[in-house]
Structure formats: C-alpha cells, structure tokens
Amino acid sequence: MTDKIRTLQGRVVSDKMEKSIVVAIERFVKHPIYGKFIKRTTKLHVHDENNECGIGDVVEIRECRPLSKTKSWTLVRVVEKAVL
C-alpha cells in the first residue's frame, strides 16, 4: 500500500471565507458514446492559513486530514498570482 499524498493544481474562484478558499480543478473526460472530450470542473474547499490567496490565483493544494465538514485540502503554494 502506498501512502502517496495527492497534490493538485487549480484556480481560486472564491476567497470570501476566513482562512478558506474554493479552488476549481478542471479535468477532461471522454464521453462514453461519442468520444468527445468534455471539460468537467470540481470545486474543493481548501484551508488557507495566512489568507494569502486572491480570486484568479493558480495554486497547488494537497490532501490532508478533515479540517471541517467540507475541508480536507490545504494550500501548499501560490503558483501564479492573478493579474488585475
């Protein structure tokens, strides 16, 4: 059994909560009948201890123990700040 920690990259879509952000993860899924690749989005609640992220930032997150009912991911680093 491997204990590999999952890490993902996504874009911040909300930062209105205190010490929390919502990150959208985009992935492509092949349609089972037609074969076309469709874009699917998953929104994850992420713990941001220092409130350093803003809307539009590209961030790297990793899985952790459950911190609340919906938060089980934590911020690793900000890959790219949003251009305003």
From Swiss-Prot:
Q: Which PROSITE patterns match?
A: RIBOSOMAL_S17
Which GO cellular component terms are attached? Answer: cytoplasm; cytosolic small ribosomal subunit
**Which keywords are on file for this protein?**
Antibiotic resistance, Ribonucleoprotein, Ribosomal protein, RNA-binding, rRNA-binding
Mutagenesis / variant outcome for changing H31P: In neamine-resistant mutant nea301
The Gene Ontology biological process annotation of the record reads: cytoplasmic translation; response to antibiotic; ribosomal small subunit assembly
SUPFAM superfamilies annotated for this entry? Nucleic acid-binding proteins
Molecular functions (GO terms): rRNA binding; small ribosomal subunit rRNA binding; structural constituent of ribosome; zinc ion binding
- Per its UniProt record, what Pfam families does this chain match? Ribosomal_S17
What CDD domains does the record tag this protein with? Ribosomal_uS17 (cd00364)
Q: Which family does the UniProt entry place this protein in?
A: Belongs to the universal ribosomal protein uS17 family.
What is the protein's known function? One of the primary rRNA binding proteins, it binds specifically to the 5'-end of 16S ribosomal RNA. Also plays a role in translational accuracy; neamine-resistant ribosomes show reduced neamine-induced misreading in vitro.
Recite the other comments.
The strain missing both S17 and L29 grows very slowly and has a rather unstable temperature-sensitive phenotype.
Q: How does it assemble?
A: Part of the 30S ribosomal subunit.
- Its protein name is Small ribosomal subunit protein uS17
State the organism's lineage.
Bacteria, Pseudomonadati, Pseudomonadota, Gammaproteobacteria, Enterobacterales
